[in-house]
Amino acid sequence: MEKWSLMTITVLLALTVRWTVSLGSYSGAGKPPMYGDYEAQRHWQEVTYNLPIRQWYFNTSDNNLLYWGLDYPPLTAYHSFLCAYVAKLINPDWIALHTSRGYESQSHKLFMRTTVFVADLLIYIPAVILYCCSLKETSTKKKVSSALCILLYPGLILIDHGHFQYNSVSLGFALWGVLCLSYDWDLLGSAAFCLALNYKQMELYHSLPFFCYLLGKCFKKGLKGKGLLLLIKLAGTVVASFAVCWLPFCTDVEQIMQVLRRLFPIDRGLFEDKVANIWCSLSVLIKIKNVVSPQTQLKLSFAVTFLSLLPTCIKLTVQPSLRGFKLTLVSCALSFFLFSFQVHEKSILLVSVPVCLIINEVPFMATWFLLVSTFSMLPLLLKDGLLLPYAVTTLAFLSACVASFAIFEKTSAKDLQLKPFSQSLRGYVSWFKLFPKIVRSLFLLSVTLMGVLSVMSAAVHPPQRFPDLFPVSVSSISCLHFLFFLVYFNVIILWDSKNSRNQKKVS
């Protein structure tokens, strides 16, 4: 009873923070002609409600794809239609074809913010609460603390309830998938992840860990017996899930091809804006977009991404465990973010939510990563006028993590899950005993640097010669952090002796 009372208070606090952030500005507010993501979501409601399904993804006189054309999978379109249906009942002007372009009002803002709030409340938040309650060998206090820190993660709050998007839907479905797999409900977990993938194609960041974990379970059960049966059931579940989601588009091959072209546009280039990945950071020294063709960029990014995630995926397939699965979700998503093609700054959320899932296991490193991930989106947040919510939610999150997990006391090799690695280095690296102090010092230096850059980005005008000095500095420093975290997570996965002991649980 006490657990659920504390969880209720946690949810109420999380909802209060979300609604408070939603009172602020949003992407593209009062900035014609393109406005921003807020207008994109409103425009998709306009298109899906007023046009037949066969025109949703095609360029027509009523659907100019150059003006926020629909470029997400069918479930996003259906969600937009559902929101539009409600909007029509309240005020038809909000989604009137053509004439509603750029519509802004306080009542419409309230409606749009409410749609995000409801989606969060129905899909993401219940998944977080049930996931934290499902944690084994964990006290009630730790379960509540984990839920509090996950729900107060500022990155997702600022993007969904500030900037304006519905990331909590796809991430929530993915989290439901993880939750189902933790109970060995493999078919339900597969279906939930298919929903996530059919809401946002960026969920491909998580697809390989799901695939490798389930394939590994099939191997362990034996492909001549129960394993083969499970594999057939999983394949059937995936096919059925996709068939249901894509059913209205399956009447015409050209419809399917056009949707796919909209989902995976090659001509947009290697990256957009000042994203904290390796390609954007390298472009400071080498203008990759100018010296390499788009097709070569695509092949290069694919090759580097594949090579970076291959070791952990092989380990997960050979030694499937729930712990290894969650860690591989982090490492694979981070590899995609750092090295893949057409990455947005908001894509770091696809790494952050899996990191949230292990905050009770490695609280120090998880907290550090989540702070950096929020900081990496600073240029976007400043553009949207979200400096105050950024500062307040980040400080609140850091305070919650320090109070809940005493993170500065969790820096030993054992606490950082590095004991197997440190034992393999014993006799070669004499300074490894100083590692806890080094990590704490690096954390404090990192937080100080992020704080100083945040203040300077908001208050100091850059030199005329370097107008992008602060955004580039933010993305480059964040990228260095992410490379460090990629190495760290790969090390604890590849040297994790617990995985082999946990295989019995998935056999």
UniProtKB/Swiss-Prot annotation:
It is a multi-pass membrane protein. Dolichyl pyrophosphate Man9GlcNAc2 alpha-1,3-glucosyltransferase that operates in the biosynthetic pathway of dolichol-linked oligosaccharides, the glycan precursors employed in protein asparagine (N)-glycosylation. The assembly of dolichol-linked oligosaccharides begins on the cytosolic side of the endoplasmic reticulum membrane and finishes in its lumen. The sequential addition of sugars to dolichol pyrophosphate produces dolichol-linked oligosaccharides containing fourteen sugars, including two GlcNAcs, nine mannoses and three glucoses. It is found in: Endoplasmic reticulum membrane. Its EC number is 2.4.1.267. Pfam families: Alg6_Alg8. InterPro entries: Glyco_trans_ALG6/ALG8 (IPR004856). It comes from Gallus gallus. The chain crosses the membrane at residues 4-24, 115-135, 144-164, 169-189, 227-247, 298-318, 339-359, 362-382, 388-408, 442-462, 474-494. GO terms for cellular component: endoplasmic reticulum membrane. Residues 1-3, 136-143, 190-226, 319-338, 383-387, 463-473 are cytoplasmic. Keywords: Endoplasmic reticulum, Glycoprotein, Glycosyltransferase, Membrane, Transferase, Transmembrane, Transmembrane helix. It catalyses: an alpha-D-Man-(1->2)-alpha-D-Man-(1->2)-alpha-D-Man-(1->3)-[alpha-D-Man-(1->2)-alpha-D-Man-(1->3)-[alpha-D-Man-(1->2)-alpha-D-Man-(1->6)]-alpha-D-Man-(1->6)]-beta-D-Man-(1->4)-beta-D-GlcNAc-(1->4)-alpha-D-GlcNAc-diphospho-di-trans,poly-cis-dolichol + a di-trans,poly-cis-dolichyl beta-D-glucosyl phosphate = an alpha-D-Glc-(1->3)-alpha-D-Man-(1->2)-alpha-D-Man-(1->2)-alpha-D-Man-(1->3)-[alpha-D-Man-(1->2)-alpha-D-Man-(1->3)-[alpha-D-Man-(1->2)-alpha-D-Man-(1->6)]-alpha-D-Man-(1->6)]-beta-D-Man-(1->4)-beta-D-GlcNAc-(1->4)-alpha-D-GlcNAc-diphospho-di-trans,poly-cis-dolichol + a di-trans,poly-cis-dolichyl phosphate + H(+). One of its GO terms (biological process) is dolichol-linked oligosaccharide biosynthetic process. This is Dolichyl pyrophosphate Man9GlcNAc2 alpha-1,3-glucosyltransferase. GO terms for molecular function: dolichyl pyrophosphate Man9GlcNAc2 alpha-1,3-glucosyltransferase activity. Pathway: Protein modification; protein glycosylation. The gene is ALG6.
